[in-house]
Amino acid sequence: MGRPPCCDKIGIKKGPWTPEEDIILVSYIQEHGPGNWRSVPTNTGLLRCSKSCRLRWTNYLRPGIKRGNFTPHEEGMIIHLQALLGNKWASIASYLPQRTDNDIKNYWNTHLKKKLNKSDSDERSRSENIALQTSSTRNTINHRSTYASSTENISRLLEGWMRASPKSSTSTTFLEHKMQNRTNNFIDHHSDQFPYEQLQGSWEEGHSKGINGDDDQGIKNSENNNGDDVHHEDGDHEDDDDHNATPPLTFIEKWLLEETSTTGGQMEEMSHLMELSNML
């Protein structure tokens, strides 16, 4: 089971040290030096165990012990040594001769441990914020690249359309030239069938007939006006019929009507070709 602690022996005093006990211990250490702690209680007559005497001297009575706040340099050393050695406070205190292991342990538990936890939390939050900013930046870059690629695609389509547009204009010019040729051929064909002298003679003949018809109509109207009252109404009725009757069509008018109907069909064909050219 091992050796029982010396503090559990009968007659060993526990609890706070008195000023008289401190004076006896300091006087003995100054005379004999620190060491051989097992003989200290017997040689001094103190009712304390050897471990209690050593800790009292090391943590409170030895000269050069520094009290008060820890400097930033001391804090850094404690943090570094605690990460390497763990909670071995006596070993850590050996690197800080002016600080006791008890003071180092208390300062670690009350200040440094909480400070490190807060620093780790802040560092974690900062890392998360950086990660979020990085992801948002990547998303922005991806969006810009997508927009650039779409813009490039549109530019390529426009470039292809500009290349294809001269072909469509060429086809439109070809259709217009073709329609112009058809119109010229149509005019030449009918001018061959109806010479200018024949058309002029037909027009003069129709015009003279129209004038003679008007003279005959005037004579008839005067005769009807000079008749008796019985025939007056009949004469008026005949005048109205003659006035509303459609005069006979001359040769030139018939030809113009035929040309108009034929030209209407040609114009429909031309409009259809123009629509096809616009679609191309």
UniProtKB/Swiss-Prot annotation:
SUPFAM superfamilies: Homeodomain-like. InterPro entries: Homeodomain-like_sf (IPR009057), Myb_dom (IPR017930), Myb_TF_plants (IPR015495), SANT/Myb (IPR001005). The modification S-nitrosocysteine is found at C49, C53. GO terms for molecular function: DNA-binding transcription factor activity; transcription cis-regulatory region binding. Residues 128-149 have a biased composition (Polar residues). Induction: Induced by jasmonic acid (JA) and salicylic acid (SA). Triggered by auxin (IAA) in roots. Stimulated by light, UV-light and cold. According to PubMed:16005291 and PubMed:23828545, rapidly repressed by abscisic acid (ABA) in an ABI1-dependent manner. But in contrast, according to PubMed:21637967, transiently induced by ABA in seedlings. Rapidly repressed by drought. Activated by white light, but repressed by blue light and darkness. Transiently induced by salt (NaCl) in seedlings. Induced by sucrose. Positively regulated by SCAP1. Mediates the inhibition of anthocyanin (e.g. cyanidin and delphinidin) biosynthesis when expressed in lettuce L.sativa and could thus be used for the development of new varieties of lettuce. Promoter triggering guard cells-specific expression can be used in tobacco (N.tabacum) and tomato (S.lycopersicum) to monitor stomata genetic engineering. GO terms for biological process: negative regulation of response to water deprivation; response to abscisic acid; response to absence of light; response to auxin; response to blue light; response to cold; response to light stimulus; response to salt. Disruption phenotype: Constitutive reduction of stomatal opening and decreased wilting under water stress conditions resulting in abnormally turgid and green leaves as well as an enhanced tolerance to drought, and associated with an altered expression of some genes (e.g. ERD10, ERD13, NHL3, SYP122, VPEgamma, ERF and ZAT genes) mainly involved in response to stress. Normal stomatal closure in the dark and upon abscisic acid (ABA) exposure. Residues 9-65, 66-116 form the HTH myb-type domain. Specifically expressed in guard cells. Present in seedlings, leaves, stems and flowers. Residues 118-127 have a biased composition (Basic and acidic residues). This is Transcription factor MYB60. The lineage of its organism: Eukaryota, Viridiplantae, Streptophyta, Embryophyta, Tracheophyta. The gene is MYB60.
